[in-house]
Amino acid sequence: MKNMPLGIKPGTYEYKRTEGEYKNRIHLRLEKDGHGVLLINANQLYHFNPSAALMAFLILEEVDDNAIIKRLQSVFNVKKKQALTDFIQFKTDFDRIISPMDDPCPICDLNLETLVPFSKHPSAPYRMDLALTYRCNNHCVHCYNEPNRAKNELNISQWKQVLNHVWDLGIPHVVFTGGEPTLIDFLPELITHAEKLGMITGLNTNGRKLSDPSYI
C-alpha cells in the first residue's frame, strides 16, 4: 500500500491511560516511512523503528497479543519465535512507558537504545505556539512586545482552521500565547476545540485574569 508500509494510515493517534487518580495523555505519530514517535503528556518523547511503531500502535489499540505476533510475522517476514521474543521484550518496556503509575528512566530502567541529539529530523514540530494577540493588560517597560503590533487579529473561525491544520500536520501540543492570550474572549472555546481534536493545550499568561474566579 502506497505510503503505508505498516498497513496503517500515517498520522497522529491519541490515547488516554488512567490508573486511579493518575492519567497519561499519549500521542503516537506514525510517519510515512513506517517509523514512529511516541509522546507522553507532551513532555516525554520516544523514537520507534517500524517494528516498534507497529507494536506500539497495536498495543494501544488493545489488539490481542497473538494477533500482534501474527501481524509481525506477516509484515516483517520473521519466524514466530523471533516475533514472540521481540514482542515480549518490547511490551515489557512499553507498558512501563505508558503507565500513569510508573515513571521509568529511559536510560537506567529500560532496555532502550539512545539516539544522538538532533540525529532525527521530525516530519513536523512536536509543539506549536500560537500568538492569539499582541495586546496585553500589563505595561512592563522591559517587555519585548510592541503595542503597535496589536491589530489584525484572527477571529474564532480562522483560529479553528489554524488548529485543524496544526492537528492535520501531526502536531499534538499547542500553547496559546501573546501578548496576553486571556484577553481573547473566545480563548475557552479554542481550548475546547483543540482538546476535542486530540491536542494537549498549554497557556502562557501573566495570570492576572486567572485570579478572577468568574473567569475560571
Protein language model features and the residues they cover:
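Acidic, low-complexity/disordered tracts enriched in E/D and polar residues
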Residues: 1-57
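Short capping segments at the starts of secondary-structure elements
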Residues: 57-67
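N-terminal [4Fe-4S]-dependent radical SAM core
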Residues: 21, 28-38, 45-47, 90-129
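Conserved alpha-helical substructure of the radical SAM core
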Residues: 75, 85, 89, 93, ...
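Short helix-coil junctions and helix-kink-helix linkers
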Residues: 71-80
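Helix N-cap / loop-to-helix initiation motif
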Residues: 64-65, 79, 155
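Phosphate/oxyanion-binding loops and surfaces in catalytic or ligand/nucleic-acid-binding neighborhoods
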Residues: 62, 97, 169
